[in-house]
């Protein structure tokens, strides 16, 4: 149905993905598999089950999941503790989720209608009005559910609510074009400029993404670009210089702001709960030196005339100055 989406989460009072105080709706499903992604529960579009084995209180003291599972042979135990599920045999009935008293089994994703979402959104209308905020739809890749995004943003605009779409832009243009009339602001990433490296670290090449970014700029669409800065993957001079050249020469520097998001090691427990490998587990780096590198990258972009912030808000400039001061002090 056009007015239903598979929702991963709704967060109220968010501050970083668009102006003001916002309600952020995360949709399930993503065509990318970024090595550094902290939200593996967003990969698949359908509803999934995560297993947190450290929360299991054992078959001996509980066993509720075994009692309700129609295919209990899919439950994988070790020392009487639930470890994982056989996802090939799981029917997705979610009975185990409802019965587990310790929340060792978690449901990722649920169906919600536009009306359901608007009920949540309207609760914070006063905060949007006072702060210049609104609604942000993110993912996953929300444009995999472009019909739902269209209907929800249309409902928001009918009530005068600011809308922001955070998207990888790795979709066909018709999906973007569909939501344009009701989207005030786009947020997207430039992860790597080299298409081969982009595919190596995200699973897809970047040609469609860069093309769609250029099309949005040509339409004078308000656009925030971000670089998730990942040590030893995209923080090298070659990639940074190529990104600056693209923004200056291909986009004519027509972006609202470029934001640098420093890598944080997040989501490892969620990967384990879904039976997926966490590719950044062995990545080793020194946090202070890496953050100094990120600040240096921001300096480079600003010197090139590209308005660049470390993280997402103007107050990050103060943090940036503090890092520079500390770096100078350490060098004395």
Where are these regions (language model features)?
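N-terminal pre-triad scaffold of radical SAM enzymes
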Residues: 7-61, 83-92
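Iron-sulfur cluster-binding cysteine motifs and their immediate structural context
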Residues: 35-42, 63-84, 95-110
